[in-house]
Amino acid sequence: QSLSNLILDCLEEKKIRKFHLLGHSMGGMIVQEMTKNKGDKISKLICYSTGPKGEMPGRFETVDASRENLKKKGLKKMARNIAKTWFVKGEDAKYFDVCIEAGRQTSMEAADNSLVAFKNWNGVDSLKNIKNKTLIIWGDKDKSYNLSQAKTLEKNISNSSLIIFNGCAHNVHLEKIDEFNRTVLNFINNE
């Protein structure tokens, strides 16, 4: 919730009154909170490879296991193990190293804090209050968020549609780049 408020405050400071909003993974949780708090400012919402539950059912490992792996194996090893689940081709994916490099930009404490925030968050009850036109994007090989998470979003957000990308994992935008970009632009540009 504090990240949601921080972003909303920044937008307010920059005098951005209305905007489209896309959230990927944990960012999807943040945009759900932003929409709950200031939905009138959001033109269209995109919930991408995310869900309404932080303790993600069907995730490749529990959040507690990720925290334990972080402590035992360190940030570098944990980041590698998690990032390889984000691609169908794992470590052989074209943009795998981009994710690893991004992971190097954080600290052990920040990584652990994000996992704690993940685990303790549940936005299911707030979904019915999201009235914004919403696109839900999910890859059929996603090991972080299963289909039930995407379906829960679709079922509980009244003005939503779900698009499933076949042959993609958690990072659809890095596996089917053109198709992903076209899908997002079409959603934003069409009434």
Regions from the language model: what does each represent?
Residues Q1-L22, R182:
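Active-site loop/oxyanion-hole signature of alpha/beta-hydrolase fold enzymes
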Residues G23, G27, V31:
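Gly/Ala-rich beta-loop-alpha elbow adjacent to hydrolase catalytic centers
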Residues Q32-N37, I42-K73, K77:
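Flexible "cap/lid" loop of the alpha/beta hydrolase fold
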Residues E55-E61, K72-K128:
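Conserved alpha/beta-hydrolase catalytic His-Asp/Glu region
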Residues I130, I136-W138, D142:
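Short beta-strand/loop motif that positions the catalytic acidic residue
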Residues K143-Q149:
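Conserved alpha/beta-hydrolase "acid-adjacent" motif
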Residues K151-S160:
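Active-site-adjacent alpha-helix of alpha/beta-hydrolase-fold enzymes
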Residues S160-E191:
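Catalytic active-site module of serine/aspartate enzymes centered on a nucleophile-bearing elbow/loop
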